[in-house]
Design a protein with these regions (language model features):
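Gly/Ser/Thr-rich loops at beta-strand to alpha-helix junctions
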Residues: 9-16, 35-36, 60-72, 88-89, ...
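Active-site rim beta-loop-alpha module in soluble metabolic enzymes
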Residues: 110-175
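A short beta-strand-loop structural module common to alpha/beta enzyme folds
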Residues: 26-41, 185-187
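C-terminal accessory domains and tails appended to enzymatic cores
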Residues: 184-223
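N-terminal basic/disordered segments at the start of proteins
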Residues: 1-24
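Extended, charge-rich low-complexity interaction segments
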Residues: 57-61, 65-66, 70-73, 113-129, ...
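Long, charge-dense
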Residues: 75-126
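Glycine-rich, highly charged phosphate/nucleotide-binding loops
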Residues: 39-52
Length: 223
């Protein structure tokens, strides 16, 4: 597959992290981050993008994981292979591996993860809080967020090596302060993102052959 003509289809948060790594001749398509909140819509949007891309490439790399089962049921075109990282969500992509993700959650289960991609697309809980204040008032917004964040203890910003992160640091600290959480930063890794682009597509990936369908079991198999 090394010489295959490839295309990446991913959500805005993942592509924000990947763009500095992409070769100039590698095609990509960005889908709306908001689709994550409607898995059935995510699935249909992904399938539509996959089908539309099939005539131009023979390998389609998805910048998505399981994502609330949004990837389950996707069908590879008759002429192209799908490559999907074997992760439940994109946090593992920013930390470098699914194992690193599990280690962070084991260290502190009440962790809310942030990365540049999430902040740049403007869809973090702090953004949602501000919108709720504008629409319903501070009292109701505070009540809603207390319910949502009652089990969280820290905000962990994943630094994947971008040059200017001042805006991201400020946003992450503000979010931690607003919701009464501890703020921490950890060093991320671009290893997984690099492997998505260039390979090798090893046991950390799901390869869906032409005309085959993605199953939940493929994500549950141990890497």
């Amino acid at each position: 597959m090394a010489g295959a003509k490839k295309k990446i289809i991913g959500c805005a948060a993942v592509l924000e992290e990947m763009l500095p790594l992409l070769p100039s001749d590698l095609a990509y398509e960005i889908l709306d981050f908001g689709l994550h909140f409607r898995p059935s819509n995510l699935k249909s949007a992904l399938q539509k993008a996959i089908d539309a891309s099939a005539r131009d490439v023979d390998t389609i790399i998805l910048g998505y994981g399981l994502c609330s089962n949004g990837a389950v049921g996707l069908k590879a075109p008759k002429t192209a292979t799908l490559v999907i990282p074997k992760v439940h969500d994109c946090i593992a992509l920013f930390l470098g591996s699914h194992e690193s993700y599990k280690q962070q959650l084991k260290a502190e289960a009440g962790t809310f993860f942030l990365a540049k991609g999430f902040i740049e697309v403007g869809d973090t809980p702090l953004d949602e809080y501000k919108r709720t204040v504008e629409r319903y008032g501070k009292e109701r917004a505070d009540r809603v967020m207390r319910t949502m964040f009652g089990h969280y203890t820290r905000v962990l910003f994943i630094n994947t090596g971008h040059q200017d992160l001042s805006k991201c640091h400020e946003h992450s600290r503000q979010m931690a302060q607003q919701f009464g959480l501890r703020y921490e930063e950890t060093k991320g890794s671009r290893v997984f993102l690099e492997k998505m682009i260039r390979g090798p597509w090893d046991r950390e990936f799901i390869l869906v052959k032409p005309d085959e369908t993605v199953t939940i079991e493929q994500f549950l198999k141990q890497t």
